[in-house]
A protein has these predicted regions:
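Hydrophobic/aromatic-enriched cytosolic interaction surfaces used to assemble or bind macromolecules
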Residues: 1-272
Length: 272
């Protein structure tokens, strides 16, 4: 995963046409990140496995404390446990959980139709989504974090406390912290930002949202096949083959029937 391609979607990526959403993308950690639309990034990375990162504006990061017995039914109970934190109907959301620490499970929640649209767009471009995580989750170990890359301005105070904001809003929040501002991890250019995200992905930080029905195996199994363009031709060839086979079988049956009749007639003549 350390050398996988990266696509980092800007805040508000799902508000308009998804293919036109602004992204930072990187073919590998050794390459310089580029800015463009999601459609352009997927076109450039066609045939590749890609790590996808969304901002905290698109994913709710939280956690729940459960006993082992309760944890057996984690996926069933999450919508009820998080009901007060949800701004959308549970059936419109996808819930993903990570490994528990001292009985507390980290949870990531994302809009399900948005997730499905993102995966479908990847498949259209023959790109295999390998991972989907939130930036605040990946950078949680470095908090507080200040991202000042144009279009990605974000304040991450803790894993579950992040604010996507413009420069004026960020300055207002920073003013409340006074001298604490000096302790912020500052990510001020695309190269540094992508490098930190790639390092966190390589270290397997954060909750993986592509699990269950959206797992990597499912994405790979249902992804585009190189034989897809040939399927109509293969189907026609198969139909022609079976028609020809049926014709040969019918012809053999007629020959066999004629041979049997000839043999029967010969036997009658011989007996007479």
């Amino acid at each position: 995963m350390a050398d996988s391609a990266l696509i980092y979607l800007a805040p508000g990526a799902f508000q308009d046409a998804l293919a036109d959403a602004r992204v930072l993308f990187q073919e590998s950690r050794a390459d310089s990140p580029r800015q463009g639309s999601l459609g352009e990034a997927l076109e450039a990375l066609s045939g590749r496995a890609v790590n996808l990162v969304v901002t905290s504006a698109e994913a709710l990061l939280t956690g729940v404390t459960l006993s082992r017995k309760q944890a057996r039914h984690l996926q069933r109970v999450l919508p009820y446990l998080l009901e007060e934190q949800l701004l959308e109907a549970p059936e419109q959301l996808w819930f993903a959980s990570g490994k528990a620490e001292h009985g507390r499970y980290p949870v990531a929640v994302i809009n399900r139709p948005n997730l499905e649209a993102l995966i479908d767009l990847c498949r259209e471009h023959r790109v295999r989504p390998q991972s989907l995580k939130a930036d605040a989750d990946l950078l949680a170990a470095q908090t507080p974090v200040l991202i000042t890359v144009e279009g990605w301005g974000t304040l991450i105070l803790e894993r579950d406390q992040a604010l996507v904001a413009d420069e004026a809003q960020r300055e207002a929040v920073l003013a409340l912290h006074g001298d604490d501002e000096l302790h912020f991890t500052r990510l001020e250019d695309p190269a540094t930002l992508c490098d930190q995200l790639q390092a966190a992905l390589a270290a397997d930080h954060g909750v993986e949202m592509l699990q269950g029905a959206f797992s990597q195996r499912q994405n790979q199994a249902s992804g585009p096949s190189p034989w897809q363009p040939w399927k109509p031709v293969m189907g026609l060839a198969a139909a022609v083959f079976f028609i020809a086979l049926a014709a040969v079988w019918a012809q053999q049956w007629r020959y066999q029937k004629a041979a049997d009749e000839t043999f029967a007639q010969a036997a009658e003549l011989y007996q007479s």
